[in-house]
Curated annotation (Swiss-Prot):
The keyword Transmembrane does not apply. This is Transcription antitermination protein NusB. One of its GO terms (biological process) is transcription antitermination. One of its GO terms (molecular function) is RNA binding. Belongs to the NusB family. Involved in transcription antitermination. Required for transcription of ribosomal RNA (rRNA) genes. Binds specifically to the boxA antiterminator sequence of the ribosomal RNA (rrn) operons. It comes from Brucella anthropi (strain ATCC 49188 / DSM 6882 / CCUG 24695 / JCM 21032 / LMG 3331 / NBRC 15819 / NCTC 12168 / Alc 37) (Ochrobactrum anthropi). The keyword Membrane does not apply. Pfam families: NusB. Keywords: RNA-binding, Transcription, Transcription antitermination, Transcription regulation. PANTHER family: ANTITERMINATION NUSB DOMAIN-CONTAINING PROTEIN, N UTILIZATION SUBSTANCE PROTEIN B-RELATED. It comes from the Bacteria. InterPro entries: NusB-like_sf (IPR035926), NusB_fam (IPR011605), NusB_RsmB_TIM44 (IPR006027).
Amino acid sequence: MNSSTEGRPTPNLPRTANKRGVARLAAVQALYQMDVAGTGVLEVVAEYEAFRLGKEVDGTQYLDADPQWFRAIVAGVVDEQLKLDPMIHQALTEDWPLSRLDSTLRAILRAGAWELQTRKDVPTAVIVSEYVDIAKAFYTEDEPKLVNAVLDRLAFVIRGESRGVKPR
């Protein structure tokens, strides 16, 4: 994972991405910022929409994102966090409680869990794949595998669908 000058994680993403994928990435970054800096949802959404999404920041061009998708993920995770966290905790192994995960990984899992629970119009495979790709942009170790396993377990619990990982 790379770090920006403001402490916000910056991913190593390829330049080709769809607007929803970019919105997912931006939502993860915004959730991270809210977690570590205590920024409120209205403030962080306004900041991203005014100064980041589709803009150039410190010499880095942010890609265009679907602003409605971005807002829905951020607001949805904030509104549903008290329901999402216990579900994620159940999907983690016993030796990896949610509190032990770093803020970026928590943001990825919360956003993915929210989409699985709320966006029934989006195929499970798309949601899991998108958030695994986001994890790969931030991590080079086993974290993307963890994201895949946890979201797959959650997909089974929430949607009755699974891509191969058995629920705990």
